[in-house]
Amino acid sequence: EQGFQNAVAGASEAIVVTTPEMSAIRDADRIIGLLESKEEIKSYKLLLNRVRPSLIKSNEMMGVDDVVEILSCPLVGIIPEDTGIITSTNKGEPIVNDENALAGKAYRNVAQRILGEEVPFLDLDEPKGFMAKIKNAFAKLKAKV
């Protein structure tokens, strides 16, 4: 707890970063409880990291809405799991500099939200390739018929 006290000393706002795993969510819930007990902390938000939509779809990972409901904390961002982060870190280059990286875009959006801008959350289920986009468009068209 002393480490927590040192970390929040002088802070008036906080961002709780967690992953959609039960042990991490329990830890985040404990941190939120500690933040709520600090008069100096006027607001706090949740940043959900390492989100994998495929695992959410297969019910192997908790969904974003479920985590937000459990923690009762406003969401500031969703960062998808991205192997490009490992590569960029090893090169010493921030992922936010990669215009094509979904995680980089997600981090840029978080920064904009922190600055008070209204930015929609990324659709992490978006098809990646050209053919996938065409198939998705036809599937949507077929669903309307």
Segments the model singles out, each with a brief description of its role:
Residues 91-106:
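C-terminal boundary of histidine-terminating zinc-finger modules
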Residues 6, 30, 106-109, 113:
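Alpha-helical scaffold segments in soluble metabolic enzymes
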Residues 109, 113, 122-145:
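A short, charged, Gly/Pro-tolerant segment at domain boundaries
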Residues 81, 103-106, 130:
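Alpha-helical structural motif
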Residues 1-77, 81, 86-87:
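Conserved catalytic-core segment of NTP-binding enzymes
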